[in-house]
Amino acid sequence: MDTKTHSLPITHTQLHSNSRPQSRTCSQCTCTHHRQTFSQSCRQSQRGSRSRSSSQSPATHQNPTGAHSSSGLQSQSPNASPPPKRHKKTMNSHHSPTRPTILHSSCPKNRKNLEGKLNKKKMAKRIQQVYKTKKRS
């Protein structure tokens, strides 16, 4: 029984690492609607992770997330499965069709950042070329 409880936090960290790229894509975009809806879901996941990490001694609190991935205890899995399902439904219904347009066309700050990076690269190349030509002559 001890080995099962030790393996559960590992699956919990794997589940969290899968959800992190979504928050990274959200932090890049500065659109207000996208940030508001995603920040709410981020807060919910942070609340859950805080409560799980603070109460590591009772194994019953960690079992729902472990049971979701390893299907060890099915009686407690309904307690943990509704929040991820709600999160996924909101992401699919609101953001997946609009996410490409948000990242590319409707976020002017994102576009400016990309243009700035390209301009910096161009300027670096120009400076290097000028430096090389001055050295030769």
Curated annotation (Swiss-Prot):
The keyword Magnesium does not apply. Pfam families: TP2. Residues 39-57 have a biased composition (Low complexity). The keyword Plastid does not apply. GO terms for cellular component: nucleolus; nucleosome. GO terms for molecular function: DNA binding; zinc ion binding. Zn(2+) binds at H12, H16, C29, C31. Residues 1-31, 58-79, 93-108 have a biased composition (Polar residues). It is found in: Nucleus; Nucleus, Nucleolus; Chromosome. Testis. GO terms for biological process: acrosome reaction; penetration of zona pellucida; positive regulation of protein processing; sperm DNA condensation; spermatogenesis. A motif (Nuclear localization signal) lies at residues 116-124. Residues 1-137 are annotated as: Disordered. InterPro entries: TP2. Disulfide bonds: none annotated. Keywords: Chromosome, Developmental protein, Differentiation, DNA-binding, Metal-binding, Nucleosome core, Nucleus, Spermatogenesis, Zinc. Plays a key role in the replacement of histones to protamine in the elongating spermatids of mammals. In condensing spermatids, loaded onto the nucleosomes, where it promotes the recruitment and processing of protamines, which are responsible for histone eviction. Belongs to the nuclear transition protein 2 family. This is Nuclear transition protein 2. The lineage of its organism: Eukaryota, Metazoa, Chordata, Craniata, Vertebrata.
